[in-house]
Amino acid sequence: MSAAPERPVAISLTNLRKTFGSLEVLKGISLEAREGDVVSILGSSGSGKSTMLRCINMLEVPDSGDVTVAGETIRLQQTPNGTKPADPRQVDRIRSELGMVFQSFNLWSHMTVLENVIEAPVHVQGRPRAECIAEAEALLARVGIADKRNHYPAHLSGGQQQRAAIARALAQRPKVMLFDEPTSALDPELVGEVLRVMRSLAEEGRTMLVVTHEMGFARDVSNKVVFLHKGVIEEEGPPEQVFTASRSERFRQFLAG
């Protein structure tokens, strides 16, 4: 019986470096995620995990190194003011393949939930409005807030806002979902409803990179766990190995709290 074919690489980071002022936040990060991988990215505050995630869609531009999405490497150029993307249109195209969910929801407060979800598909991707509305309504039902379609974000709980943000990201039909601490701004009783949606996305086979403090999610849902410490990947592997037989003393201390 032949082995299953290896899944294509969805995201590849090679020797990524990033400095803010005199502080080197990423010190040569290399990481690979294949299609269908769920990668949980762990680390203490200031370890570089959110910066690494934000470099994937160029919200932060790395000083050096390569970011490759679905086989296409983002071209960078050195300028007197630092490193910049060489082709903004390339960045826009690659961003359209990446759904981003932020810690602070980042919904547009002057738009209803439905308007938030259809904004990018209609006005950025140029898809027919009626088609986008139908898809948005299905996504809102999918994340359990179909009854909130005409509400404004201020009238939603934090958990409902984050589920709306997930629907908004999915509406762009991304190849990869990026989550930057999606539950850390939520009241404890609201965390579960967001994690349930994320778990169901993983079960669909979606490619996900998740910066998180939720150890249960990392242990039970991920197929790869990455631990960053001071801008370096200290530990990486499947959760059953990382959580039970870690080679990193720092990671064991991190787990012990």
Name what the model sees in each region.
Residues 8-239:
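ABC family nucleotide-binding domain
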Residues 1-7:
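Short, low-complexity, intrinsically disordered N-terminal peptides in bacterial proteins
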